Amino acid sequence: MKRLPYVALALLFVLLLPAWSGAQNVQSYVDQGIKASQSGRYDQALEAFDQALKLKPNDPAIVTYKGIVFYAQGKDDLALKQFEAALKLNPNFGRAYYQRAMILEKQEKFDQAVADLRKAKSLGYNVEPNFIALMETKAAAQR
């Protein structure tokens, strides 16, 4: 009888270990991807983010990281697809709105960029008010 609590604890540990290990691996891949992208090793970054997505396929942050890498490579269409995919996974993910606004600015779709920046800010993402004002000025000049 005295062993029962220890057996239960051991069983709980065995059952929870794979989930904890998977979470550790996801974060490890994400960290590798961020470091690789910061040093310009974009292909390695994409590989790391793909590995993370295999373990956690519905994570909008990881999808957004992939989009940021594509954006850094100048692959705006691929980046835009990633940001939109992230927003489908979580329509309240402010960073994806912010990143999509960067693409929209390059495409000179300033009204849409302003809307995305405002949405990102309303969701708590740190957007400088001066940047929104700049986009508003560009949008007004375009009309």
Identify the residue ranges that each predicted region occupies.
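Helix-start (N-cap) detector for alpha-helical repeat units in TPR-like alpha-solenoids
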Residues: 25-27, 60-61, 94-95, 128-129
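Position-specific recognition of the canonical hydrophobic site in helix A of tetratricopeptide repeat
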Residues: 30, 37, 64, 70-71, ...
